[in-house]
Amino acid sequence: MLFPYFPLSELDVSAVRTQKENLKQFELTQFAHYEIYDLITNRTQFCDHLLRDLWLRFGLVKDNTLTLIAVGGYGREEMFPLSDLDFLILTSEQVEAQTEQKIRQFVQFLWDCGFDVGHAVRTLSECEQAGRDNITVATNLLEARYLEGNFSQFQQLDNVLQKADFWPREAFFQAKYQERVERYQRYHNTSYNLEPDIKHSPGGLRDLHLLYWIALRHTGAKNLTDILNSGFIYPQEYAQLLESQQFLFKVRFALHLILKRYDNRLLFERQIRVAELLEFVGPGNQGVEKMMKSFFQALQTISLLSDLLVKHYREHFLQTNEPVQVRLLDKEFQCVNNAICLRQANLFVEQPEQILSLFFHLTQDHQLDIHSSTLRQLHLALEQRSGYLSELPVARERFLRLFNQPGAIARALVPMHKYGVLKAYLPQWHHIEGLMQFDLFHCYTVDEHIVRTLLKLEYFLEAESVVPHPICSQIFSRLTDRTLLYIAALFHDIAKGRGGDHAELGAVDVAQFAQQHGFDQREIHTLTWLVEQHLLMSVTAQRRDIHDPEVVLHFAEAVQNNVRLDYLTCLTVADICATNETLWNSWKRTLIATLYQFTTQQFAQGMDCLLDHAEKIENHRQQALTLLTQNSLLSAVQIEEIWQHCPEEYFLRNTPKQIAWHTELLADNQTELLVKISNRFSEGGTEIFVYCQDQPNLFHKVVTTIGAKKFSIHDAQIITSHDGYVFDSFIITELDGKLVKFDRRRSLEKALMQALNTSKLPTFRATDNPKLQHFHVKTEVRFLKEQRTDQTEMELFALDQTGLLAKVSQVFSELKLNLLNAKITTIGEKAEDFFILTNSEDRALTAEQRQCLTQRLHEVLEPK
């Protein structure tokens, strides 16, 4: 043993705890110097020797009716620093009171020593019944390993477990496979979540365990070597599984060394320390990203081979009595019971372009699957191949043909990614496979994000997409050729991780791809523009004032025509949705839809002049007047009297429903201060409407109070009338993007009234997000190119720290700057905010004022 257990001279909990802690210190200091299997074996043997010693100390060795048996992971001899100590005490008869007391003391001693104990005391018949009743118990028993006591009893248990009717092979397989299906669903059917569970994520250790359990039930094999010797896997598959298992074991062992409580989730804050233990180094976060790339590639290998071998087992051992139905697909492929098989061996080696034909057949019949023998041939052919499939002219034709087939993405591109074909086709794919982005914004690796973007585009064809994505659904359904949009999505993030602007580098890549694949010049220009500008609409909608005609004109000039606008809109929405499920909400949908509508109007009007909002303002007034006439008791005179105080900008930036709501509120208001919050009138968010005489620090008071109540602010609209009254609107949501419920709205109304009724500035105690301490975002202030002399547009990039807006607004007040508008965007740990400002003379900021503002923001947001 590397670090042996020393038998106790007397029963002493502290002595065992000391040995246990010394073992952990040995593992921490020597982790890099020993093979992981040696460390796991050493810990398993440490526990074995401890239990045998205690079995003797508590006098249980004298009782010939008892047998101590390791089960579960402990039975498999997979002991990690925080693994449960699972064992069975098998008894030939009901335990007497004296023996029961000894067992209780034995177990309690282990708990006192700091072990998490999972134990059961059962007779042979009780074990059999419990195993028959529960697949988890049955699985634990199948991994039983003798430790101490009556060995013949252990053999009797083994005989019971080998009975043909004790979980017959097919029933056992179906039960364990169903567990896998349910587990995959919990993890969104992907290995590529950026905070994965080493044990339970697809491709994790549980997928290896599934192979063990199937082989164990079928042949009695207890490890990968036994499975290889049984002929169930090929030597190449064995080598790949062994390498992947070894890496996951190292990561899990390191994770357990840095934690105090059992957990297998590789959270961001843990990835840094695990990477250090595994000696992954590099500037910034490169060490973590290198480790996670290797980790995700290991998951992918295990997931792929697990899927292949599970198929192989089902086809060759469980479906042997089914009638065989063979259907010819073409000269190279045939269908055997709905599984695609090759008609000649080595087809993929001799004619590699036929690999693309395999996935074409999947799109033609959605009932088809790929036979395990075909998957094996595919896997071996890809392992042997040195060049890229895209170098073959016939393969290029067949690759492009896929995009116009029904279910092209779900039926062809997704399995091509899963089985390594995309990596074999596109030279750039290998670099992004398993490439994570160490931030709180992205949920998936780059390759998984791209595939999910493609899937989202295809989803726009489904009838159920009409409600959440009405514009995209309409656009996508009328496209006759979706190939360009799919190719743009395939390349939009393909250059990430190389350094430089990934959009510009990706545009170069897609241009080369398009030329190689025979696209014409118009198509090449469209593709390169889409990839290079794939963030344009998202940035404009979320970080610009889209009600400003100049903003709309500049956006329209960049887009140029309706075809590009349609493509860009679909790509933008799919990209946002595929980045993080929580990002897309009705508020973002409204922003994108509004920009789409304005740009369409700009194209219709022509590009030689700004979009004229006069007609829209008048339409809003008339529609609001109609609503008020129908639904309120206000007269036209009363309405007009209220509207006289509202600047034209107010009617442009608010919908008719909002205007009608505000008008009714103002008509009923008898005080100088009005604060109302509603979900009814602002699409996509909860609206706060504030009406009062302008006052110092108003914005600061509002955002500080909102922050103290733990809401997300998405938009701030500051409108001041000529007589000094503000008509301010704030769009907020709960932190998870949901609308604010009634009780929370009333509570916030009360808090805002209190804050605005006093000159005292509100404060709240900042609560740091522990995840943020591992991220470093440099504060950056950018002033957009001055288009106007009456206002300044500023972008702020900073760590999304608690009270950020309160600090920023305090700087504005300190420098006597007026805030006209704000767009608040949080992207993971990063705040990307947009402000429109004027100085105290209602002019654009001077160069000196911009410099002073930049300096103060750095001082406040990055204190030394």
Curated annotation (Swiss-Prot):
How activity is regulated? Uridylyltransferase (UTase) activity is inhibited by glutamine, while glutamine activates uridylyl-removing (UR) activity.
Q: Which SUPFAM superfamilies has this protein been placed in? A: ACT-like (SSF55021), HD-domain/PDEase-like (SSF109604), Nucleotidyltransferase (SSF81301), Nucleotidyltransferase substrate binding subunit/domain (SSF81593)
Q: Which domain of life is it from?
A: Bacteria
Q: Which biological processes are named by the entry's GO terms? A: regulation of nitrogen utilization
State the InterPro entries in the record: ACT-like_dom_sf, ACT_dom, HD/PDEase_dom, HD_domain, NT_sf, PII_UdlTrfase/GS_AdlTrfase, UTase/UR
MF GO annotations: [protein-PII] uridylyltransferase activity; phosphoric diester hydrolase activity
Q: What is its EC number?
A: 2.7.7.59, 3.1.4.-
| Cofactors, names only | Mg(2+)
Show the CDD domains listed in the entry.
Answer: ACT_ACR-UUR-like_2 (cd04899), ACT_UUR-like_1 (cd04900), HDc (cd00077), NT_GlnE_GlnD_like (cd05401)
The chain positions of domain HD read 446-562
**Pfam families referenced in this protein's UniProt entry, alphabetically:** ACT, GlnD_UR_UTase, HD
**Sorted UniProt keywords:** Hydrolase, Magnesium, Multifunctional enzyme, Nucleotidyltransferase, Repeat, Transferase
**Region described as Uridylyltransferase:** 1-328
ACT domain: residues covered: 687-766, 793-864
| Catalytically driven reaction(s) | [protein-PII]-L-tyrosine + UTP = [protein-PII]-uridylyl-L-tyrosine + diphosphate; [protein-PII]-uridylyl-L-tyrosine + H2O = [protein-PII]-L-tyrosine + UMP + H(+)
Cited HAMAP family? PII_uridylyl_transf (MF_00277)
What is the stated purpose of this protein? Modifies, by uridylylation and deuridylylation, the PII regulatory proteins (GlnB and homologs), in response to the nitrogen status of the cell that GlnD senses through the glutamine level. Under low glutamine levels, catalyzes the conversion of the PII proteins and UTP to PII-UMP and PPi, while under higher glutamine levels, GlnD hydrolyzes PII-UMP to PII and UMP (deuridylylation). Thus, controls uridylylation state and activity of the PII proteins, and plays an important role in the regulation of nitrogen assimilation and metabolism.
Give the domain section of the comments: Has four distinct domains: an N-terminal nucleotidyltransferase (NT) domain responsible for UTase activity, a central HD domain that encodes UR activity, and two C-terminal ACT domains that seem to have a role in glutamine sensing.
By sequence similarity, the record places it as follows: Belongs to the GlnD family.
Name the record gives this protein: Bifunctional uridylyltransferase/uridylyl-removing enzyme
The source organism is Pasteurella multocida (strain Pm70)
